[in-house]
Amino acid sequence: MHFLAFLLCLIPLALCIIEPRDIDGPTSHEAPTDLPIDWHILSQAAGMAHEPYCLFGDIGDRVGDAEVLWSKGHGVVIQRVKIFHSKSLGVTVSFEGTTASLLSILHDVNAALIDPPKEVAPAYCEGVKLFAGFSNAYMELRDEVYEQIVKFQKQFNDKRVTTTGHSLGAAMAVLAAMDLNKRLDDGIYRSFAFGMPRTGNGAFANDVDKKIGGRFFYIVNGRDWVPRVLPRELGFQHPSGQIWINPPSTTHWKYYPGQENHYGANSEDPILTFEDYHGIYSHICLGYGPGKCPASVGTVYLP
């Protein structure tokens, strides 16, 4: 918990070196709807999003309908990543959120908007800018993750590929989804980003909508502050696909269509604590400390 408090203190420093600009994208005023996806699928994705936080146990562990197939990293030099085969979501890659590692924290505060690295540039339209630290974190794992995904697709004869993650891992999940959607013959199947910070500019948000819209969802728990950073006034913009759990850590969830929906999570001020950040998403408690290891699916009672 202390390292996240430290991170929260560093964010104002990062903001000081970024030039304010006009809001770079639309604000949706569409009314919320029921979920466009079965909540059991969200629960399965949340369980796999939590599993990289687990330090012990690994290959062969079961998380709901999925089995851990491969793991790399310890959250110190690179973010931990795990690959599963899930009966409902196919070959699934899950990225770890922020850890106590200085390098992990530096990924979070390296908040410049940069051009996509040349290796992933073909996945994006012109004008896209990415959060530098999140992009760097993904690039450190990109090639090996791709090799493992292709191997497991063949092993299980399963073309479906899903990405997921929490916090920093959620940002990596959407970057992976865009990259893999270009690299894989059949694109991606689904992408779920829990507690995702804003990861790029308006062109990025539009590109996500265009290329993986309807397959990408980001989930906000209550007044979690992480999805509110960095501010839109600094050129950052969420894509469409918001599912808002409100009140937090309950089964009261709705889908908020369009980008930065006026009636969604932006309608309430963030709470600068970690209760909602480390909250319960679709019956799964996510994050270091409160989350169960190994991860489980659908085991937390919700009001």
Swiss-Prot record:
The active site is at residues 167, 224. Disulfide bonds join 54-293. It is found in: Secreted. It comes from the Eukaryota. GO terms for cellular component: extracellular region. Belongs to the AB hydrolase superfamily. Lipase family. Class 3 subfamily. This is Secreted mono- and diacylglycerol lipase LIP4. It comes from Malassezia restricta (strain ATCC 96810 / NBRC 103918 / CBS 7877). The gene is LIP4.
